[in-house]
Amino acid sequence: GILLLVLFLMSLVLFAPDLLGDPDNYTPANPLNTPPHIKPEWYFLFAYAILRSIPNKLGGVLALVSSILILILMPLLHTSKQRSMMFRPFSQCLFWILVADLLTLTWIGGQPVEYPFIIIGQLASVLYFFIILVLMPITSTIENNLLKW
């Protein structure tokens, strides 16, 4: 049984390699346009949405790189004296807003580049950077003052 299966698969691969091929493999390439069926993996869709939200190519690439490198700055931006978020309700709320924003960016990254998705992606991208760079340190400082640390 195994030999028949191997014989069938080898004859398929060696004698008719294009039989199961994708027809998109034979269309001429356009280096200025990404085909609509090409999408990154689901865990990079948020960064892909940030890349597409900026019309300038260099700006989009810089935003893409900074959206991933900004995660390196997280320990420096965490200015709270208390490690846990149990007694920090503002930080809890901000965390869930960031999670919702990342889910929105992930959803937008999988959508086509059309009118409502472009605007939603731009707003979600601005909110992503605004939460991490501005709101997180301000919220931590306010909560430090409220807890008298």
From Swiss-Prot:
Pfam families (alphabetical): Cytochrom_B_C (PF00032)
Question: Which segments cross the bilayer?
Answer: 1-16, 58-78, 90-110, 117-137
Tell me if Electron transport is a UniProt keyword of this record: yes
Any one annotated GO CC term: mitochondrial inner membrane
**Superkingdom of the source species:** Eukaryota
UniProt xrefs under PROSITE patterns: CYTB_CTER
Cofactor binding annotation: Binds 2 heme groups non-covalently.
CC cofactor:
heme
The biological process GO terms on file are: mitochondrial electron transport, ubiquinol to cytochrome c
Q: Which Gene Ontology terms cover its molecular function?
A: metal ion binding; ubiquinol-cytochrome-c reductase activity
Membrane topology term reads:
Multi-pass membrane protein
What are the UniProt keywords, alphabetically? Answer: Electron transport, Heme, Iron, Membrane, Metal-binding, Mitochondrion, Mitochondrion inner membrane, Respiratory chain, Transmembrane, Transmembrane helix, Transport, Ubiquinone
Predominant location of this chain? mitochondrion
Q: What does this protein do?
A: Component of the ubiquinol-cytochrome c reductase complex (complex III or cytochrome b-c1 complex) that is part of the mitochondrial respiratory chain. The b-c1 complex mediates electron transfer from ubiquinol to cytochrome c. Contributes to the generation of a proton gradient across the mitochondrial membrane that is then used for ATP synthesis.
Of which family is this protein a member? Belongs to the cytochrome b family.
Question: Any remaining note in the record?
Answer: Heme 1 (or BL or b562) is low-potential and absorbs at about 562 nm, and heme 2 (or BH or b566) is high-potential and absorbs at about 566 nm.
| Quaternary structure annotation from Swiss-Prot or TrEMBL | The cytochrome bc1 complex contains 11 subunits: 3 respiratory subunits (MT-CYB, CYC1 and UQCRFS1), 2 core proteins (UQCRC1 and UQCRC2) and 6 low-molecular weight proteins (UQCRH/QCR6, UQCRB/QCR7, UQCRQ/QCR8, UQCR10/QCR9, UQCR11/QCR10 and a cleavage product of UQCRFS1). This cytochrome bc1 complex then forms a dimer.
Q: Which PANTHER family match?
A: CYTOCHROME B
Entry protein name: Cytochrome b
